[in-house]
UniProtKB/Swiss-Prot annotation:
SMART domains listed in its UniProt record: KRAB, ZnF_C2H2
Subcellular location: Nucleus
Source species of the chain: Homo sapiens (Human)
SUPFAM superfamilies, alphabetized: beta-beta-alpha zinc fingers (SSF57667), KRAB domain (Kruppel-associated box) (SSF109640)
Taxonomic classification: Eukaryota, Metazoa, Chordata, Craniata, Vertebrata
GO CC terms: nucleus
Disulfide bonds: none
Residue ranges, compositional bias (Basic and acidic residues): 536-549
Name of the protein in its database record: Zinc finger protein 273
Function text: May be involved in transcriptional regulation.
Length: 569
């Protein structure tokens, strides 16, 4: 194919009117071969550094433009296989074909544009026009013309006159070409060219006065200030409360009944979405349609099953940068990070108490509202937490799934088993800061601390006796009432306290969990072991005032005292 020495070159008809010219064009070097238009001709690539400098709105704009360009090519009937870039963008991922190094500009081509009736919409024409500037503007845009595959030079001249307005767009000051030293970029405004250069040099001239953070463009600094200064842009129309994030406003709206039209008939709780109400109802019905194929455990919500499955794989892809701890779920890592920051962003409006997590605040609020949405089907007792209901159910079933490997004893709760194991391990992780005494159970430490303060806030109305712990007062009241609620299933004997029943049961089972490390002798009570140890140490702490005798236990000491008083033992 040849072109006339003067005038516009002739272009062979192309499929759908699209293609590249094979002719030499004045002002442009080299002879170019004809080829079909590809997605690469209308795609814009970013380096990793450039992509990271874009804010979210700019990245979203890029995604939309690239997807539109691809759809337009398909609309025009051009056979284009789906590029990896488009697949990534459709899935919401980062672009897959980011440049890892500086790109060298390819030799230009003369891009033949299309007749007006071949453009499906104006936006496509504008997009192609910008791409021409980006790819070929370096070589001068005065030679780029919109052409149709015309049969003669005269027909081409007539056609050309219809595109004067569009050709003028290529020569306006708004479309000046700015050459970046590292990347061949065409930017349509001088300010954009400056921004691009700042991103490549790493300069960040815009600094936040509050925290010292630097940004490469002013818009990034503005966005940062919104977060840093906690400016409340989003206002609740119902109560007037303002928030700095739209998501926080959405969560807040739930507290207003007028925006929660979906109400639970069982407990009266209201929700702003019917789907949320449906999920909530499963609490009352105990419906659990989602079953784990590995262990058979069932769940009421599919997302919880998905999270549960990770237990079987053992995968923990989310690691804490502070302590290195790994987590199977990203949200768990986010919650964990609050431990290091000490942040407690969730505050109770009733009492002012603050919490690390929103779920803890939700549970806490039930103390004030008295809400108990979790009801036992056996006895009708209600609870404010699902975990408490789960533990309660074991009372009816009698199930004891947690077994001690040392002695074979079984327990209803895992926490009770953990405490029990400390008998053998001698572990005492809870230490008193005042006296250094250590305990195996946290509640025992809490009770012990009151010794140092001397406080006895719990008083008996019958006799006036005061106690440090509420549970001790409850047990004391049984002295007056004669109540013995703890009954032995073996012999029928009843006791005031559960601890006494536990000790009594060892008579029937023969269990002796307290073992002497010196001689190996075992005892069914810790107090008996303590007394026994004095045999090995020779300690005799009990001494009468009237003589030099000493005793290693209180019973012998008491008998000796009665001898002094003339009493017969």
């Amino acid at each position: 194919m040849s072109s006339a020495p003067r005038g516009p070159p002739s272009v062979a008809p192309l499929p759908a009117g699209i293609g590249r010219s094979t002719a030499k064009t004045p002002g442009l070097p080299g002879s170019l071969e004809m080829g079909p238009l590809t997605f690469r001709d209308v795609a814009i690539e970013f380096s990793l550094e450039e992509w990271q400098c874009l804010d979210t709105s700019q990245q979203n704009l890029y995604r939309n433009v690239m997807l539109d360009n691809y759809r337009n090519l398909v609309f025009l009937g051009i056979a284009v296989s789906k590029p990896d870039l488009i697949t990534c963008l459709e899935q919401g991922k980062e672009p897959c074909n980011m440049k890892r190094h500086a790109m060298v500009a390819k030799p230009p081509v003369v891009c033949s544009h299309f007749a007006q009736d071949l453009w499906p919409k104006q936006g496509l024409k504008d997009s192609f026009q910008k791409v021409i500037l980006r790819r070929y503007g370096k070589y001068g845009h005065e030679n780029l013309q919109l052409r149709k595959g015309c049969k003669s030079a005269d027909e081409h001249k007539v056609h050309k006159r219809g595109y004067n307005g569009l050709n003028q767009c290529l020569t306006t000051t708004q479309s000046k070409i700015f050459q970046c030293d590292k990347y061949v970029k065409v930017l349509h405004k001088f300010s954009n060219s400056n921004i691009h250069k700042k991103r490549q040099t790493g300069k960040k001239p815009f600094k936040c006065k509050e925290c010292g953070k630097s940004c490469c463009i002013l818009s990034q600094l503005t966005q940062h200030k919104k977060t840093a200064t906690r400016v409340n842009f989003y206002k609740c129309k119902t109560c007037g409360k303002a928030f700095n994030q739209f998501s926080n406003l959405t969560k807040h709206k739930i507290i207003h009944p007028e925006v929660n039209p979906y109400k639970c008939e069982e407990c009266g709780k209201a929700f702003n979405q019917s789907l949320t109400l449906t999920k909530h109802k499963k609490i009352h019905t105990e419906e659990k349609p989602y079953k784990c194929e590995d262990c058979g455990k069932v769940f009421s919500v599919f997302s919880v099953l998905t999270k549960h499955k990770i237990i079987h794989t053992g995968t923990k892809p989310y690691n804490c940068e502070e302590c290195g701890k790994g987590f199977s779920i990203f949200s768990t890592l986010t919650k964990h990070k609050i431990i290091h920051t000490g942040e407690k962003p969730y505050k109770c409006n009733e009492c002012g108490k603050a919490f690390n997590w929103s779920s803890t605040l939700t549970k806490h609020k039930r103390i004030h509202t008295g809400e108990k949405p979790y009801k036992c089907e056996e006895c009708g007792k209600a609870f404010n937490q699902s975990s408490t209901l789960t533990r309660h159910k074991i009372v009816h079933t009698g199930e004891k799934p947690y077994k001690c490997e040392e002695c074979g004893k079984a327990f209803k709760r895992s926490t009770t088993l953990t405490k029990h194991k400390r008998i053998y391990t001698k572990e005492k992780p809870y230490k008193c800061e005042e006296c250094g005494k250590a305990f195996s159970v946290f509640s025992t430490l809490t009770k012990h601390k009151i010794i140092h303060t001397g406080a006895k806030p719990y008083k008996c109305e019958e006799c006036g006796s005061a106690f440090r712990a509420f549970s001790t007062l409850t047990e004391h009241k049984r002295v007056h009432t004669g109540e013995k609620p703890y009954k032995c299933n073996e012999c029928g004997k009843a006791f005031n306290w559960s601890s006494t029943l536990t000790k009594h049961k060892r008579i029937h089972t023969g269990e002796k969990p307290y073992k002497c490390e010196e001689c190996g002798k075992a005892f069914n009570r810790s107090s008996n072991l303590t007394r026994h140890k004095k045999i090995h140490t020779g300690e005799k702490p009990y001494k009468p005032k009237r003589c030099d005798s000493a005793f290693d236990n209180t019973p012998n000491f008491s008998r000796h005292k009665r001898n002094h008083m003339g009493e017969k033992s």
